[in-house]
Amino acid sequence: MKIRKLFALVLALTAITAVAFAEFDTSKTIAVVSREEGSGTRGAFIELTGIATKDADGKEVDNTYIEADFVNGTSLVITTVSQNDAAIGYASLSSVLHNDTVKMVKIDGVEASTENILNNTYPIARPFNIVTNGELTNELAKDFMAFIMSKEGQAVVAEDGLVPVANDETPSYTASGLKGVVVVGGSTSVAPVMEKLGEAYAALNPEVEVDVQATGSSAGVAGALDGTYMIGMASRALKSSETDGGAVGTVIGLDGIAVIVNPANSIEDLSVEQVKKIFTGEVTVWADANK
């Protein structure tokens, strides 16, 4: 009786192992997951991968696959990919660096990491910007910006997985003792590190609250210009139309854009060109992804 039970247990474990290590079905249709229009991550991604082109008038054309699943926000991209073994998406490196619900794909043989962004070998990287409508006049907002760009603020940026812009001449921060609320709004990718910066700043200035609103990069720039936000957030370089309108960007750190798939997917490496073909709909089946 015991032998039969043991044999049954061995068979069950063998079956489980076989399922766990079953080869991914590459005949599956690729489920492309993209960010919504106005997303700074999307804007940077389509530019860096060649998905965006120029028309005859020199205007940018976004050639993202029309059948893609367009979702709002970084967390929803991650959730969508984690729940579909045929899905592929992209997200801020800092948001997936320690997330095992999705798998980061190498790009041109290079892993997405802060080290590879710093040494310029990872090809899909972009700046994180804070945005104002010119020179700040609000003392509290100015002080918070000073903290972000200080040694202490840049340490928070580094701890969040970004490449900081600090150097040997970066000043230390001295608590100001100011009171009030700083309203910051924009990129959903920048928002997590901004929340941590706000917490660190408030710890030094207990009577200050930093209100971070994640609304998207374009909304962040527009909000900084029209006064909705004291400080905007953009997870991309500012457009000429935005700077012409008075927007001023300050880079607080560099972030990679990780291409992510479901952990069940056997794909490990894609070239930038292959990524482009997938996200424009030229390649629609996983079996053709590495061709």
What are these regions (language model features)?
Residues 21-291:
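Exported/periplasmic ABC-transporter solute-binding proteins
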Residues 2-22:
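Sec-dependent N-terminal signal peptides of Gram-positive bacterial secreted proteins and lipoproteins
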